[in-house]
A protein has these predicted regions:
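Charged, heptad-repeat coiled-coil alpha-helices that serve as long linker/dimerization "arms"
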Residues: 1-85
Length: 85
């Protein structure tokens, strides 16, 4: 019974980990674009604002996913401890 309870939690944990990795890659790409000195020219203001907004949104989403992952991981650890003990 505990194994059956554990399975969906592990699946959820894996899904969240995959999403975190995806968001981290997207964030790295945005930050790499923000490192381009040419982006700070007056002609690039619209693009700069867009990238800054995207960066903020990615960070917000990543923070939420990480918090959810921590909760799920605690549940997984708790169920695994019950199963072992």
């Amino acid at each position: 019974e505990l194994r059956q309870k554990l399975s969906p939690w592990r699946k959820k944990q894996g899904t969240l980990e995959a999403r975190m990795e995806q968001l981290q890659q997207q964030l790295a790409t945005v930050e790499q674009n923000l490192a381009d000195p040419g982006l700070y020219d007056d002609q690039q203001k619209v693009r700069l604002k867009g990238l800054l907004a995207e960066q903020a949104e990615l960070k917000r989403e990543l923070e939420g996913i990480e918090a959810e992952w921590l909760e799920v991981s605690e549940t997984v650890e708790s169920l695994e401890a019950e199963l072992a003990g």
